[in-house]
From Swiss-Prot:
Source lineage: Eukaryota, Viridiplantae, Streptophyta, Embryophyta, Tracheophyta
Positions in the Extracellular compartment: 77-78, 156-171, 215-231, 287-313, 377, 445-482
Protein name, per record: Auxin transporter-like protein 2
Gene source species: Oryza sativa subsp. japonica
Record function comment: Carrier protein involved in proton-driven auxin influx. May mediate the formation of auxin gradient from developing leaves (site of auxin biosynthesis) to tips.
The keyword Iron-sulfur appears for this protein: no
């Protein structure tokens, strides 16, 4: 007799194999092994594609705000919290992958076909736990992805300003909003193969540029490292790191794009380990060199002298933020398509036109709240806490609370934690920690800091944290207080 879990995996593999053949045929990819440029650049679904997608999506503009977080936390806390939240995020990404496999296995046993349908997290929750969980997952996930897209637009405007300051940041936001709207033409995560690969290369360059440039620059005169100095700053910085390693709100969509999604289990962990090689050296080197000056410079580029190397890093980050905007927006496009009955449409142009209304509110919110840095912490505390930490942990406990569910589970506990009780204990710890530290203390600190930005700069700020321009006979304005 074949165990239930093995049967479930075989069913998913068989269905994925059919889907791969159908997609290849539809795209004109040859079956006899001949080289195809379309397949190389556009047709992604392997384990490597998923790894590049996870790693690329995890380290976008946060590279530039992590030094700011270090100035709030101090060096030791900054390093430890990165490792802690990185491992915690890998755990909940693993839980999401397990629940996806469970949901898909159950549905395929019922004869449900997912041809021309992308499974999403709220549908997994609906199938396993019911409509109330679906509503919670839909609300938190969509709101998080909405603001995740907003953050990418804000980051584009913030970065390009360090190359061309003839236009203010608000104007740059208008321009990049129009550029990023072209992501409506990318059908699904299958088609991010070349973009994910390039995106990770771009962030790798930027991270090592920050680390090396800071080391070469050396410590500024009179540098101080007073962090952590205030509770509100400490927990604001901590929630930015919580946000950094909470990029798996698109895990289900990435898994669904794989030919063999049951192989996803440890991909996010391996991606996180690579991300550590980028975030730890760059953030610590920048904080060592500039110290407390980072408290009023949330974008690391602002403290480094202009050079060809810096301009290259800025341009590469701009391209990568376009890619990350697409990553965050694509699940929103899917939700909208399903709501208006366009999800099964094969025409790329028709789907692109149907998706455009999603870009408008993102554009508008980026203009209202241009607070690069503080907005990351607020989103991390209020949305990421639930979307990618609390809800996956609770839903895993509830899905496997009965003995029969555990017996027939499509995925058994992992080798490194081979008991259901052990998994439940870890899940309870994650829920308690994130609820108290992430949402509670982090929410208080990040919202307090966010309100200060509004009080200092106002909504619709034309040029957030721009250096003051000198005017004859006019005193320079005081720098913003944090």
């Amino acid at each position: 007799m074949v165990p239930a879990g093995d049967q479930a995996e075989e069913a998913i593999v068989a269905d994925a194999g059919k889907e791969e053949a159908e997609v290849r045929a539809a795209m004109g990819v040859e079956q006899d092994g001949k080289f195809s440029m379309t397949s190389l650049l556009w047709h992604g679904g392997s384990v490597w594609d998923a790894w590049f997608s996870c790693a690329s999506n995890q380290v976008a503009q946060v590279l530039l705000t992590l030094p700011y977080s270090f100035s709030q936390l101090g060096m030791l806390s900054g390093l430890l919290l990165q490792v802690f939240y990185g491992l915690m995020g890998s755990w909940t990404a693993y839980l999401i992958s397990v629940l996806y496999v469970e949901y898909r296995a159950r549905k395929e046993k019922e004869g449900v076909s997912f041809k021309n349908h992308v499974i999403q997290w709220f549908e997994v929750l609906d199938g396993l736990l019911g409509p109330y969980w679906k509503a919670a997952g839909l609300a938190f996930n969509c709101t998080f992805l909405l603001f995740g897209s907003v953050i990418q637009l804000i980051a584009c405007a913030s970065n390009i300003y360090y190359i061309n300051d003839r236009l203010d940041k608000r104007t740059w936001t208008y321009i990049f909003g129009a550029c990023c709207s072209t992501t409506v033409f990318i059908p699904s995560f299958h088609n991010y193969r070349i973009w994910s690969f390039l995106g990770l290369g771009m962030t790798t360059y930027t991270a090592w540029y920050l680390a090396i440039a800071a080391a070469v620059h050396g410590q500024v005169d009179g540098v101080t490292h007073s962090g952590p100095s205030k509770m509100v700053l400490y927990f604001t910085g901590a929630t930015n790191i919580l946000y950094t390693f909470g990029g798996h709100a698109v895990t289900v969509e990435i898994m669904h794009a794989m030919w063999k999604p049951q192989k996803f289990k440890y991909i996010y962990l391996v991606a996180t380990l690579y991300v550590f090689t980028l975030t730890l050296p760059s953030a610590s080197a920048m904080y060592w060199a500039f110290g407390d000056a980072l408290l009023t410079h949330s974008n690391a580029f602002s403290l480094l002298p202009r050079s060809g190397w810096r301009d290259a890093a800025v341009i590469l980050m701009l391209i990568h933020q376009f890619i990350t905007f697409g990553f965050a927006c694509t699940p929103l496009y899917f939700v909208w398509e399903k709501a208006i009955g366009m999800h099964g449409t094969r025409s790329v142009l028709t789907r692109a036109l149907a998706r455009l209304p999603i870009v408008v509110p993102i554009w508008f919110l980026a203009i209202i709240f241009p607070f690069f840095g503080p907005i990351n912490s607020a989103v991390g505390a209020l949305l990421v806490s639930f979307t990618v930490y609390i809800i996956p942990s609770l839903s895993h406990i509830l899905t496997y609370r009965s003995a029969s569910a555990r017996l027939n589970a499509a995925e058994k506990p992992p080798p490194f934690l081979p008991s259901w009780s052990g998994m439940f204990v870890v899940n309870v710890f994650v829920v308690a920690w994130v609820l108290v530290v992430g949402f509670g203390l982090g929410g208080w600190a990040s919202v307090t800091n966010f309100i200060k930005q509004i009080d200092t700069f106002g909504l619709f700020a034309k040029c957030y944290q721009c250096p003051p321009r000198a005017h004859a006979g006019a005193p320079l304005p005081a720098p913003p207080r944090h």
